[in-house]
A protein has these predicted regions:
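A structural signal for short hydrophobic beta-strand segments in well-ordered beta-sheet cores
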Residues: 71, 188-191, 240, 251
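Active-site metal-binding loops of divalent metal-dependent hydrolases
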Residues: 56, 152-153
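A short, conserved acidic/glycine-rich loop-to-beta-strand motif
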Residues: 169-179
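Generic preference for hydrophobic
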Residues: 71, 122-123, 199, 251
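Conserved N-terminal catalytic core of the sugar/cofactor nucleotidyltransferase
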Residues: 2-4, 11-15, 19-27, 31-51, ...
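Residue-level signal for inorganic ion chemistry
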Residues: 80, 106, 138, 152, ...
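Catalytic-core segments of class I nucleotidyltransferases/pyrophosphorylases
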Residues: 26-27, 146-147, 154, 160-167, ...
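Conserved beta-strand termini and adjacent loop/short-helix elements that scaffold enzyme active sites
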Residues: 123-125, 176, 252-254
């Protein structure tokens, strides 16, 4: 949530600030001042992250007959703990888990998060709410820039670099984009520079606008929550197209590790190839 303030500055300082305004990465004087203050305060990453862990994991059966996706093992720890490791690498320790299916097991295992070096709160879904609905429920906890991550993927992303792009672009949402050889199985990003114009769903390989796909990792501003309809809602279908039309949706291509563990075949591939967060 942004508030209007009035500043009185030396004219020479203002000249230096204005010299950095280019209309692209730095939109205007207000934007330039915000970036300078963030840098001075060391606010180089969001302070809070949401992990979406409410799904049933039907494609991971029989494993998920007994345990939720959030607790499936990867290299001696749960899938979710690898996300904790990524966040802690950037000193992000205020984490919210959106839980639904088998939520009691998840909450019993992670409790308040102190055993894992984090502070953990929960958004409880009494019915499936999709990838966007839980954010509506957690609105009161999400009052400044925040991260959202799917809970069934392993990823290694430079969050500091991504956040810098997000702020410089004056984005309402920035999507981390990963590269795949065959984009025909995914929604593929069409971009103009860093701005996402649209996602083309499962194009023929030769007709794909790029090889960049949604990695299930986002940085958002609280204003995004006001665009989410009540009840079941998907970021991909109900929110991102609105942001793209507004010109406020951006993409951050990254080359780090990314594994989707959403089915047995992909999970087994991740077990073999994933390198733990250092």
């Amino acid at each position: 949530m942004k508030e209007r303030v009035t500043l009185t500055l030396d004219s020479n300082i203002l000249k230096k600030i204005d010299s950095g305004v280019n209309g692209f990465k730095i939109k205007n004087r207000s934007h330039a001042v915000e970036l300078l203050i963030m840098k001075a305060l060391g606010a180089n990453v969001p302070k809070k992250a949401v992990i979406l862990a409410g799904g049933k994991g039907t494609r991971l059966r029989p494993i998920t007959y007994e345990i939720p996706k959030a607790l499936i093992p990867v290299h001696g720890k749960t899938l979710t703990e690898h996300l904790f490791d990524l966040f802690k690498k950037y000193d992000i320790k205020d984490i919210i888990m959106a839980v639904g299916h088998m939520k009691e097991k998840i909450e019993e295992h992670f409790a308040d998060g102190s055993r894992f070096g984090i502070k953990l709160n929960y958004i409880e879904e009494n019915e499936p709410l999709g990838t966007a609905g839980p954010l509506k429920l957690g609105k009161n906890m999400l009052t400044e820039s925040f991260i959202v991550s799917n809970g069934d993927e392993l990823k290694d992303i430079n969050i500091e670099e991504m956040y810098q792009l997000h702020k410089e672009s004056n984005a309402l949402a920035t999507i981390a984009l990963t590269t795949v050889e065959d984009p025909s199985k995914y929604g593929v990003a069409r971009l103009s520079g860093s701005k996402i114009l649209e996602f083309v769903e499962k194009p023929k390989k030769e007709e794909a606008p790029s090889k960049l796909i949604n990695s299930g990792f986002y940085i958002m501003e609280p204003e995004v929550i006001d665009l989410i309809p009540k009840g079941f809602a998907m970021l991909e279908k109900d929110v991102f197209p609105k942001l793209a039309k507004m010109g406020r949706l951006f993409g951050y291509p990254f080359s780090g590790q990314w594994f989707d563990t959403g089915n047995i075949e992909r999970y087994e591939k991740a077990l073999k190839e994933w390198k733990d967060i250092k």
